[in-house]
């Protein structure tokens, strides 16, 4: 939030007139986000739950960006990513962890019963939409959900699909549920489709294969260097 404030202040002082992309999060919709639209009510989550600190900070950033946009006529565009994955993803993302463990034949651990539902968006589709946010003048002043509502699957189903697609013998192990988890997270991307012409192209299985290849290639480079 402080970082967002600093960036906005600098943009104001420099008179930025091209485009300012403010990255928010789908977490602002809380623990139940079914086909959430940009104008739907956002939530702050329960005070004291560490998970929601991130969502609250991002939501505060959204409000601040909107205020700067109106007050100083800054070309703000807010995006809310929904479960983006693919090459370059941080090592603590569920899909990344599942693929790495499947490639190694290690147990895949799931928090809770695995019935949590997610919609997975491949990074190339995500970047395409960001580029539209940068270049399309109609995007200025708007917020957009970016995700793939066609790639919907439970966490258990995701683990099973990864094992099948990668021909892995990994076992799925269930762990105690997290104290604060999101039961369902599926975006509505109708606004991005209408305004930006956005449509995700990479289905889940293709995305899994592309991500797995990237991981394997990275491992090969590491082995060569070592």
Regions found by a protein language model. Give the residues of each.
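Conserved SDR Rossmann-fold cofactor-binding beta-strand/turn motif
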Residues: 24-25, 80-85
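Glycine/proline-rich active-site loop of Rossmann-fold NAD(P)-dependent oxidoreductases
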Residues: 33, 59, 75, 84-97, ...
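Catalytic helix-loop patch of NAD(P)-dependent Rossmann-fold dehydrogenases
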Residues: 1-9, 13, 18-19, 27-78, ...
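Hydrophobic "lid"/C-terminal helical patch
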Residues: 130-134, 159-162, 208-215
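Non-catalytic, hydrophobic alpha-helical segments
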Residues: 126, 130, 146, 158, ...
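C-terminal "lid/loop" region of Rossmann-like NAD(P)-dependent oxidoreductases
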Residues: 113-115, 141-145, 153-159, 167-184, ...
């Amino acid at each position: 939030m402080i970082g967002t404030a600093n960036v906005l202040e600098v943009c104001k002082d420099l008179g930025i007139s091209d485009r300012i992309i403010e990255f928010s999060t789908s977490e602002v919709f809380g623990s139940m986000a079914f086909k959430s639209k940009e104008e739907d009510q956002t939530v702050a989550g329960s005070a004291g739950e560490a998970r929601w600190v991130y969502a609250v900070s991002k939501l505060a950033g959204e409000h601040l960006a909107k205020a700067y946009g109106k007050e100083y006529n800054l070309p703000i565009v807010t995006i809310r990513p929904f479960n983006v994955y693919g090459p370059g993803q941080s090592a603590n993302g569920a899909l990344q962890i599942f693929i790495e463990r499947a490639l190694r034949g290690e147990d895949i651990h799931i928090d809770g019963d695995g019935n949590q539902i997610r919609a997975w968006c491949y990074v190339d589709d995500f970047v395409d939409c960001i580029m539209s946010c940068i270049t399309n003048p109609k995007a200025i002043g708007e917020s957009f959900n970016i995700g793939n509502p066609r790639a919907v699957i439970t966490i258990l189903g995701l683990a099973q699909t990864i094992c099948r697609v990668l021909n892995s013998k990994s076992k799925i192990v269930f762990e105690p549920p997290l104290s604060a988890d999101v039961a369902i997270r599926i975006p509505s991307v109708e606004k991005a489709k209408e305004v930006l012409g956005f449509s995700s192209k990479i289905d889940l299985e293709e995305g899994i294969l592309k991500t797995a290849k990237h991981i394997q290639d990275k491992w090969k480079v590491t082995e060569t260097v070592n």
